[in-house]
Amino acid sequence: MERIDGVAVGLCAHSPYLRPFTLHYRQDGVQKSWDFMKTHDSVTILMFNSSRRSLVLVKQFRPAVYAGEVERHFPGSLTAVNQDQPQELQQALPGSAGVMVELCAGIVDQPGLSLEEAACKEAWEECGYRLVPTDLRRVATYMSGVGLTSSRQTMFYAEVTDAQRGGPGGGLAEEGELIEVIHLNLDDAQAFADNPDIPKTLGVIYAISWFFSQVVPHLSLQ
């Protein structure tokens, strides 16, 4: 997962996942404009494996995070790209710079698929757990990336067991996914969320906090 080489950067001319726009508007009589991206809505799912007394998370390489870390360490690395020809980065970082711990998640891009069905699909593809929509509890729906996008993300929770794990997970190779499934012991979860040295998403921190607030008081952890 962390063996990354041959990194080159070019301008994005077309993407099925995002599209840039500029919104022009007048606010209190003042003419303004704002750049934004149209992106897909998404779902995340926090799973608690009661057989292992652990939270099910995923770890994967995120190219955008990696590129941002390269620019942060070597300012100007992304400014000289050519739209016609991607340029290899002259200075790079180890692949670990782009690896994140996250919730199982995915974009909602299939017409006719409910949010619950999309979450079940991701639970199987990424983590190997078989779920049906009735297994899910909706935690929250919120806006993500409000300065740049208008996408909504919906978080679900499900309690699972080892018996529901029928596959290895790992994501879909044909979609470029390479995912490691993590079973985080409950005894370590809060320290994990509080540790600033472990690269993780805000969703993981929120989900763990929600779990200990809303679920743990009602669990039998004997």
UniProtKB/Swiss-Prot annotation:
EC number: 3.6.1.45
Disulfide bonds: none
Gene Ontology MF: a single term: ADP-ribose diphosphatase activity
Gene3D superfamilies: Nucleoside Triphosphate Pyrophosphohydrolase
Cofactor or coenzyme needed: Mg(2+)
Keywords: Cytoplasm, Hydrolase, Magnesium
Catalytic activity: UDP-sugar + H2O = UMP + alpha-D-aldose 1-phosphate
Domain of life the protein comes from: Eukaryota
One GO cellular component, as annotated: cytoplasm
Domain Nudix hydrolase intervals: 38-206
Cellular localization per UniProt: Cytoplasm
Residue runs in coiled coils: none
Main location: cytoplasm
Record-linked SUPFAM superfamilies: Nudix
Function text: Hydrolyzes UDP-glucose to glucose 1-phosphate and UMP and ADP-ribose to ribose 5-phosphate and AMP. The physiological substrate is probably UDP-glucose. Poor activity on other substrates such as ADP-glucose, CDP-glucose, GDP-glucose and GDP-mannose.
PANTHER family in the record: UDP/ADP-SUGAR PYROPHOSPHATASE, URIDINE DIPHOSPHATE GLUCOSE PYROPHOSPHATASE NUDT14
Oligomer status and interactors: Homodimer.
Similarity annotation: Belongs to the Nudix hydrolase family.
Name assigned to this protein: Uridine diphosphate glucose pyrophosphatase NUDT14
